[in-house]
Amino acid sequence: PVWSFLYRKMIHKLVAKGYRCIAPDLMGMGKSDKPISIKYHIYDTHCDNILTFIKKLKLKKITLFCQDWGSLIGLRIAGENSNLFSGIIAANAEIPNFTEESNPLYIPEPLKINTKIKSFKKAMAYHMLNNNGFNMDIFQVWVTYCITTPFVHISEIMGLSLSRNFKKDQKILDAYTAPFPSFIYMAGPRTLPSMNAGITGQTLKAIDGLKKFKKPFLSLIGLQDKLLGTPRIQNRFIKMVPGAKGQDHEQFKEANHFIQEDIGEIMAERMHKFIVKNKI
């Protein structure tokens, strides 16, 4: 449920080193337009939007830093359009290889708002971030919470998705809720998790492309993130992507799901080091 505010620590450091940094907000998020219909928010639409954005700005030689939905969208685009990219950093990232037959996720039917939901934590979706490993049943709880809650508790979600060592600043947490003045504008954060249920083979071409991606590829994970920050997912990328060979992959004990908020300055330093090392 985040927006480009998440990247402020990284952008500050990288711009100071002379880089051009672009952090687009997905439609329905941040400062972008917010279609109020949940039917607008499907995986293909968001991928098409970002690819159009890249082409409109005529971006080339991109060094991609992607995390969470930034990776489900970004890695698909990079896998299908490798000519636009010079390198990739995948941090707490994933691109699922679901087919119509293998995707276990679903949107609850009939779809109704559950007025009994009073908080993210009480809805038990927090288990998604604190269980002992990736579990599709737990992720389904997250999907159901977002699509049926009468209010997406974004600042609470952020607080539970940051490092145990992170000094929680309520003003910072509230900044993630700020783009959504009322429930009607929350169609984006409500539907992003359930968009996974609509992935039925669209990523397979991109995965094939990533298997042939020989340009530099770096994997960084926050070990407190039990969903995407797992060595299993990191090793999958290292084995799958040819360009991952010889790179300085790292695991950070002090970081959780939103690694850009927890250790954004370190992420910027690693990105700079990656670019310099590989002469991108």
Residues covered by each model-derived region:
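Active-site loop/turn elements of alpha/beta-hydrolase fold enzymes
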Residues: 26, 93, 254
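Conserved SAM-binding loop
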Residues: 23-24, 66, 90, 260
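Flexible "cap/lid" subdomain of the alpha/beta-hydrolase fold that forms the substrate-access gate
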Residues: 6, 29-65, 69-248
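Glycosyltransferase donor-binding loop in the core domain
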Residues: 2, 225, 256-259
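Hydrophobic residues on the short alpha-helix immediately C-terminal to a glycine-rich phosphate/catalytic loop
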Residues: 10, 77, 270-274
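Catalytic active-site module of serine/aspartate enzymes centered on a nucleophile-bearing elbow/loop
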Residues: 244-280
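Conserved HGGG/HGGXW glycine-rich cap/lid loop of the alpha/beta-hydrolase fold
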Residues: 1-31, 53
